[in-house]
Amino acid sequence: MTGAEEWKLSMGLEDTVPARLHEHGEASWTAERSHVCSIRQANDSAGALPVAGKPEPMARSLASAPVSPWHHMDRGSTTPAKARSHSASYHCPSSSQICVPGVGSPSAGYGDVPGASGHRPNLLSWPPALSRKESFLILTAHNRLRSRVHPPAANMQRMDWSESLAQLAEARAALCVTSVTPNLASTPGHNSHVGWNVQLMPMGSASFVEVVNLWFAEGLQYRHGDAECAHNATCAHYTQLVWATSSQLGCGRQPCFVDQEAMEAFVCAYSPGGNWDINGKTVAPYKKGTWCSLCTARVSGCFKAWDHAGGLCEVPRNPCRMSCRNLGHLNISTCRCHCQPGYTGRYCQVRCSVQCVHGQFRKEECSCICDVGYGGAQCATKVGFPFHTCDLRIDGDCFMVSPEADTYYGAKMKCQGKGGVLAQIESQKVQDILAFYLGRLETTNEVTDSDFETKNFWIGLTYKAAKDSFRWTTGEHQSFTSFAFGQPDNQGFGNCVEMQASAAFNWNDQRCKTRNRYICQFAQKHYSRWEPGP
């Protein structure tokens, strides 16, 4: 690149943002516009972010913070982002994150940069895969930065490296000039909820850790109290990096040419992914509070390294302090008893007939699961679908939050009477969105029933004696869990599960006679077949 060349970065939006790059000697770039920030700026910004216990005025740092033109992009969009360089187009491989041709000073970690003196670099001599040391440094950087968020996070989890996610990231980085996403379904242990951070940089201009610092520097523009990014800025890389419930990380780097310019694609994959929004409002990436104060039961330990500002939730070394009765088997990884037939309860200490007209009888639940279009205790009542009462939709399913309170089985019957079931939360995505929504309801919504006892909400999970485990109302096994720290703990008496307001709406086992509000769910397969009422 000689002289001054203009890059026009179009992301398929109405606005096109110019950024003029100049070469000042070998392998040194600067930018005239604040839309593209240097790696040195990013590192300085990351270091300038307030640390818990050392708050700094956010306004002081905003002037030097990186600003990006892609703040209007929908984080949940499936439309591939596009970028243009020298009037030639290429497709970034990210759909939910932004692929940015950034600029910066050369990284000392790379030594002599191929192509720095102006000749075309040999990509075959460039190491494409991350070494074990680089992977360790990237993971360490993520955990260190996650421990430095401000305000401090009460539920931030420690991340572990995933080779399967790293392979996904390598594959996506290799597709530098295409919008095709790797097949997530072929990756063992990961569902489709995978988050992405993608960055395209001039070759040799940055190490991977510096790119991670660049993403974290976007936090200067993020207002956690409003769950919003500053005007004319993007924070999508930052919010995914510090998404509290993302616990698995894998990254990849690949060299490539973009319009004859040597570039590097930096990609990180996160599971479970984040950056969800609800009714156009983005969900906050973590819960504010004292470090590790809202860890779930699965990650009840608190990890803090020497260079961490705060603690991160992790799996404790000795998670179980219990035993199972009546020949029950204790699963150490889940801290749950698997009971012999005929026994149930948390410790297998508890030793149920209903005629179902239009439905199936579930022995574990001692109740009916109604066919589509029918409700009531015996599934004998034909019901119409209440389309107008959906409070929110998640992945096609309808969720209704009750204004009144009832016992668990009273709530179950009321949902069933409308043709639905108590909510089944089977992924981190649904948990995050519901917790965010209920948190806003807590201060804005009025309860019509004045005798409710708590601000908690029943979901369709109960402890089944015959199965010696928690099961959903439909009888399905509970594969996803979000129990609060120290829960479940009611020793067989709290067999029903609620979303607990005081624990950031993580789960708590509760006595089924407690009066709570509740959440009804109508699956897409149900209302797509529903017969309209008269």
Curated annotation (Swiss-Prot):
The main location class comes to: secreted
Does Magnesium show up as a keyword for this record?
Answer: no
- Keyword set, alphabetical order: Disulfide bond, EGF-like domain, Lectin, Receptor, Secreted
Pfam families from the entry?
CAP, Lectin_C
Q: Where in the cell is it found?
A: Secreted
Q: Which residues form the EGF-like domain?
A: 316-349
SMART domains found in the cross-reference section: CLECT, EGF, SCP
> What are the disulphide bonds in this sequence?
C324-C337, C339-C348, C415-C520, C496-C512
Record GO cellular component, one term: extracellular region
Q: Mind telling me which PANTHER family this protein's record contains?
A: CYSTEINE-RICH SECRETORY PROTEIN-RELATED
Q: What is this protein called?
A: C-type lectin domain family 18 member A
The record lists the organism as Mus musculus
**Lineage, opening ranks:** Eukaryota, Metazoa, Chordata, Craniata, Vertebrata
Q: Which gene encodes it?
A: Clec18a
